[in-house]
A protein has these predicted regions:
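Conserved catalytic or regulatory cores that recognize and/or transform ribose-phosphate-containing ligands
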Residues: 1-146
Length: 146
């Protein structure tokens, strides 16, 4: 059984723990469900599970950056939460580094307004943007986990 790795990218700085983690914890069971339907294993990387502002475990910011980028570059799928994307240097760097990787599918999750207000350069390598988690999961099921 093939295993895919999915990195959940999105703004963390300046957000409460629930704001940075809620959308991720909502999406994880849906991703696991579609993976099981496709007879595929999926490893989901929620960066909040490793480093966060509520329970800091890092000694240097570079440690967090190195870890996150290592996870991005070893993933086949990245889902970016559009809310706050354009004001999150970490998420922008993850996106830029990931966009250089040929086998990484980058998808966006956000409202129509967030999509319309996103700078064209930040949209360039996002294959598809959905405003609903279920539609995003349908796309992943039909076009990514194949």
């Amino acid at each position: 059984m093939e295993e895919k790795k999915c990195y959940l990218a999105g703004k963390m700085s300046g957000l409460t723990f629930d704001e940075m983690n809620g959308w991720r914890t909502d999406l994880i069971p849906k991703l696991k469900e579609i993976a099981s339907v496709k007879d595929c294993k999926i490893k989901i990387i929620n960066p909040v599970d490793y480093y966060n502002f509520k329970n800091p475990t890092h000694k240097r910011e570079e440690e967090v950056e190195d870890f996150d980028l290592q996870q991005v570059l070893s993933s086949q799928l990245m889902v970016i939460k559009l809310k706050g994307f354009d004001t999150s240097p970490g998420t922008i760097i993850e996106y830029c580094k990931g966009s250089m990787k040929n086998d990484l599918v980058i998808l966006g999750l956000g409202t129509k307004e967030e999509e319309e207000n996103l700078h064209p350069w930040l949209k360039r390598y996002i294959r598809r943007i959905e405003n609903d988690e279920d539609k995003l999961c349908d796309y992943i099921r039909d076009y990514v986990l194949i």
